[in-house]
């Protein structure tokens, strides 16, 4: 009986040692993410994602507004395309994430300055937009106008 009690006590101590040696759980809240990311400002064209992904000539100062609106109406995600060619996906500050289209629709085809929390992962960029304004001083060439 004493032998079984000793074995159980040793096994229990081993489990406690292993649990204490495990790394702490990963942070998952937006507050924790914000603590690890900095506020940034990006500038670029609000448009559908399909054209600049499929057409390398797609850039931040020239687009077909009809094509962009057709893609957006069909459900293509909205992005901000910078002059450097980086695409920023707008995301919410909540989990689960919620749609940002309503916030961005008035800016489709416009060059904007967006400020917020920026995230990057393996070359993909996202931004939680806290402020967005049109940059009227940047000329965007719209096909068909």
List where the protein language model places each region:
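OB-fold and OB-like single-stranded nucleic-acid-recognition modules
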Residues: 20-145
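Hydrophobic h-region of N-terminal signal peptides that target proteins for export
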Residues: 11-20
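Bacterial N-terminal signal peptides that target proteins for export
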Residues: 1-11
């Amino acid at each position: 009986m004493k032998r079984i009690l000793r074995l159980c006590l040793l096994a229990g101590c081993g489990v406690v040692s292993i649990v204490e040696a495990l790394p702490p759980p990963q942070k998952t809240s937006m507050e924790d993410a914000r603590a690890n990311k900095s506020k940034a400002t990006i500038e670029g064209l609000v448009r559908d994602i399909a054209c600049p992904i499929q057409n390398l000539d797609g850039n931040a100062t020239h687009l077909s507004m009809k094509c962009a609106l057709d893609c957006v109406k069909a459900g293509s995600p909205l992005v901000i395309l910078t002059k450097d060619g980086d695409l920023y996906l707008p995301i919410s500050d909540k989990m689960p994430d919620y749609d940002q289209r309503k916030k961005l629709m008035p800016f489709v085809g416009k060059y904007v300055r967006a400020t917020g929390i920026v995230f990057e992962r393996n070359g993909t960029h996202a931004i939680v937009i806290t402020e967005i304004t049109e940059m009227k001083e940047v000329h965007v060439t719209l096909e068909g106008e």
